[in-house]
Amino acid sequence: MSGTHKKLGARHKARKRAVDFLFEAEARDLDPVDLATERAELSGKDDSVAPVAPYTVTVVTGVAENLDRLDEVIRSHLQDWTLERLPAVDRAILRIAVWELFHATDVPPVVAVDEAVELAKQLSTDESPGFVNGILGQVVLVAPQVRSAAAATSRRTETAGGESNDAGS
């Protein structure tokens, strides 16, 4: 049990660090993947720089690679708000949670939502946890279909790739 608790604690810290990188990258107009990678390299050389967990880099990379789709999903669930009007930290938290709901098959949906709400409690406004929970409560309903479609597309791509290689030989 304590091993599970430690693992969840490590994942929580990795998510929080991912929020930090996404927030900083947006504020400074930097590439978030480059930022996370540079910090990871720097942490290996400079003990004063906190280590960057591999899951942090995975999340930041996943969000960056799927940013347009993630933002589209978040926008579709906003009522009387625009994505740009949200606090930047809320955008980062929502992007991470939606990415986990759609792509992190080892993260149960309830964990992705709970972690996002907890990060909003720690890092954002008093209204943010309820707002984040409301948006993700809607997104979680479509997540299984999105995961299934992504898996089917991936299988078709792998099959087509194999066939085209054989045909070209």
UniProtKB/Swiss-Prot annotation:
On whether Transcription regulation is a keyword of this UniProt record, the answer is yes
Gene Ontology cellular component annotations, sorted alphabetically: cytosol
Single GO molecular function: RNA binding
Name its GO BP terms in alphabetical order. Answer: DNA-templated transcription termination; transcription antitermination
One Pfam annotation reads: NusB
* Lipid metabolism as UniProt keyword: no
- Region (Disordered) spans which residues? 150-169
Q: Where are the transmembrane segments?
A: none
Task: Cite the entry's keywords alphabetically.
Answer: RNA-binding, Transcription, Transcription antitermination, Transcription regulation
The organism's place on the tree of life at top rank: Bacteria
Query: Record's InterPro entries?
Result: NusB-like_sf, NusB_fam, NusB_RsmB_TIM44
Instruction: State the family named in the UniProt similarity comment for this chain.
Output: Belongs to the NusB family.
Q: What does this protein do?
A: Involved in transcription antitermination. Required for transcription of ribosomal RNA (rRNA) genes. Binds specifically to the boxA antiterminator sequence of the ribosomal RNA (rrn) operons.
List the protein's name: Transcription antitermination protein NusB
Organism expressing this protein natively: Rhodococcus jostii (strain RHA1)
The gene it comes from is nusB
